[in-house]
Amino acid sequence: MFVKTGDKVKVIAGKDKGKEGTVLSVNAKTNRIVVKGVNKIKKHEKPSQTNANGGVVEKEGSIHASNVKVIAKKEDNNK
């Protein structure tokens, strides 16, 4: 896959077209990625030990990898 975690990408299609962000996670099996600050969705969560109040939580949803283009690769300091 051409996108790796930590790369800076720009959305080229969809409702968030033009937005930029860093890749948080990659699912190579479904060709979907999660980009920070892009494709925000609201999820209703029940109260639990980690989230005592529960309620509506806003988080990033996944988008298809074909809808983004890489602006800058993550710098690898091990080279």
From Swiss-Prot:
One Pfam family, short name: KOW
Gene3D superfamilies: 2.30.30.30
GO CC annotations on file: ribonucleoprotein complex; ribosome
Disulfide bonds: none
Entry annotated with the keyword Cell membrane: no
GO BP of this protein: translation
PROSITE patterns named among the record's database cross-references: RIBOSOMAL_L24 (PS01108)
CDD domains in UniProt: KOW_RPL26
Single Gene Ontology MF annotation: rRNA binding
Regions that span the bilayer: none
SMART domains found in the cross-reference section: KOW
Keywords for the protein's UniProt record, in alphabetical order: Ribonucleoprotein, Ribosomal protein, RNA-binding, rRNA-binding
NCBIfam families attached to this UniProt entry: rplX_bact (TIGR01079)
PANTHER family in the cross-refs: MITOCHONDRIAL RIBOSOMAL PROTEIN L24
Family in the record: Belongs to the universal ribosomal protein uL24 family.
Chain's role: One of two assembly initiator proteins, it binds directly to the 5'-end of the 23S rRNA, where it nucleates assembly of the 50S subunit.
Subunit structure comment from the entry: Part of the 50S ribosomal subunit.
Protein name: Large ribosomal subunit protein uL24
